[in-house]
Curated annotation (Swiss-Prot):
Functional pathway: Mycotoxin biosynthesis
Keywords annotated in UniProt: Glycoprotein, Glycosyltransferase, Membrane, Transferase, Transmembrane, Transmembrane helix
One cellular component (GO) term of this entry: membrane
Catalysed reactions listed for this entry: stromemycin aglycone + UDP-alpha-D-glucose = stromemycin + UDP + H(+)
Glycosylation sites recorded in the entry for this protein: 350
Name of the protein: UDP-glycosyltransferase
Membership in a protein family: Belongs to the glycosyltransferase 28 family.
């Protein structure tokens, strides 16, 4: 994929919108581009594992590399898949409305009205209708490879490692093969000593907002205009006194920005001076040691797209978030941060500069102290959970032992494979048996027979 193709793909994600039919279709068009690499991935993996000299004992994959699931099923190689959030269709709970991770408003039914819950269920139908072409596209690819459909399981038959934790995620019961292991972060991070100008900026300012939208989000000129205007309003009101912005491709937006707001060096805001690092209140860098910045005491806020890593780092380092998610799991992360009381979620398509400035003011002043308490609360929970990455390594080792010794005897001869030791037995039963429906039918019959006899006696003898 070329750089331009990569940008075009993520622009397509940015243009998607769950609130409109065309926007929902745009999401699945972008996903079709992602999954168009599935045949190549599948063929290369199949060639690799078919060679005894290179056949792996275990596969660790990302959720988008779903060809690994087909390889697992075909070659019986144990698998672990990494997810940035709880998988959408696995381990569903009745108190989690709609499509988990893709809800419009409510993450759980606790504070949702009946109308809200109906709206979430209707949204699921809208998504299913929008993904029609996507489903047909996947089916055709799989047929060409000689594979049938692979419906998503309610419970996994492989190890699922979720880089998140309860407190951010809605708590729910999980099968043994699903493990929250987040936040997965390195024990150390690059210090700010390697960026002396940035370190000096953070030392001479007391209330800095850190702005970063990741490496893939394309910022259109109108959004940059509103962001800068809102940040300048917050600076002028004294809510913040500095802005650090990690933005590597800002030069490309200058011409678009000029057509958006007119001559950018005129008026109250000198956009050119800001983007060219000539405004001493702003420090715009192409790359930033993010964790080192978030760890600085002068950084009081984080304006973020809420990617998986950014969300975990913000929570771990205890920085409240002005959330402006763009696509995918970012949208759910924005809602989660707001629900946890550590941030304010904003709509990337409809926000105003005034709204941004007001939200910055709300978080900085924190009149009730609730944001500070929740930030500290969630930071401590995240710190405790960050040790669970070692549990993930232990569980991988455990699954490898089970796979190695469940299909051969002491002489190394193949025998009937034992069921996966962490898989609950209901996954290998019919739906009727797993839910005891046959047992309930027997109970009903046993109850119905004596009742029928009593009724017959009363009708014919009494």
């Amino acid at each position: 994929m070329t750089v331009e193709e990569d940008k075009a793909l993520y622009r397509l994600f940015d243009e998607s919108d769950a609130s409109t039919a065309e926007g929902r279709k745009g999401t699945f068009r972008a996903l079709m581009k992602f999954h168009s690499w599935w045949p190549e991935t599948y063929q290369n993996l199949k060639a690799l594992v078919s060679d005894p000299a290179h056949r792996p004992n275990f596969i660790l994959a990302d959720l988008l590399a779903d060809a690994c699931i087909d390889i697992m099923n075909e070659f019986e190689i144990p698998l672990a898949v990494h997810y940035p959030q709880m998988p959408i269709q696995m381990a569903p709970q009745k108190y989690i409305p709609g499509m988990p991770g893709a809800q419009l408003k409510h993450l759980s039914s606790e504070h949702a009205s009946l109308w809200d819950r109906l709206r979430e269920e209707y949204h699921v139908l809208q998504l299913i209708f929008a993904m029609k072409d996507y489903i047909l596209f996947q089916r055709k690819m799989r047929q060409e490879m000689g594979l049938g459909p692979r419906p998503p399981p309610r419970k996994p038959d492989y190890l699922v490692l979720v880089n998140s934790f309860f407190g951010l995620e809605v708590p729910k019961d999980l099968p043994p093969l699903m493990i929250p292991i987040g936040p997965v972060l390195a024990d150390t991070f690059q210090p700010l000593d390697t960026a002396p100008e940035l370190l000096h900026f953070l030392h001479v300012h007391r209330r800095v907002i850190y702005v970063a939208f990741g490496s893939h989000v394309e910022l259109p000129a109108w959004r940059v205009h509103r962001l800068i205007k809102g940040l300048c309003q917050a600076l002028e009101s004294g809510d913040i006194d500095g802005v650090v912005w990690a933005w590597k491709d800002r030069a490309s937006v200058l011409k678009e920005l000029e057509s958006e707001v007119g001559p950018i060096a005129k008026g109250n805001i000198d956009y050119y001076a800001i983007l060219d690092n000539k405004d001493e209140r702003f420090k715009i860098v192409g790359w930033a040691p993010q964790r080192a910045i978030l760890d600085q005491p002068s950084v009081c806020l984080y304006l973020s797209h809420c990617g998986a890593s950014s969300t975990m780092e913000a929570v771990y380092h205890g920085v409240p978030v002005v959330a402006m998610p763009v696509y995918g799991d970012q949208l759910a992360n924005g809602k989660r941060l707001e629900a946890a009381g550590v941030g304010i979620n904003m709509d990337r398509k409809n926000f105003t500069a005034e709204e941004l400035s007001t939200n910055i003011q709300t978080l900085v002043h924190d009149k009730q102290g609730s944001f500070a308490r929740n930030v500290l609360r969630l930071q401590r929970i995240a710190s405790a959970n960050s040790r669970r990455k070692h549990v993930a390594a232990d569980r991988i080792e455990e699954v490898m032992y089970d796979a190695e010794l469940s299909s051969s005897d002491r002489a190394g001869k193949d025998v009937a494979r034992r069921p996966m030791h962490l898989q609950t037995p209901d996954c290998r039963m019919s739906w009727v048996k797993a839910n005891n429906l046959d047992l309930y039918l027997v109970y009903i019959a046993l109850l119905a027979v004596p009742l029928g006899v009593v009724r017959w006696i009363s009708k014919n003898w009494l």
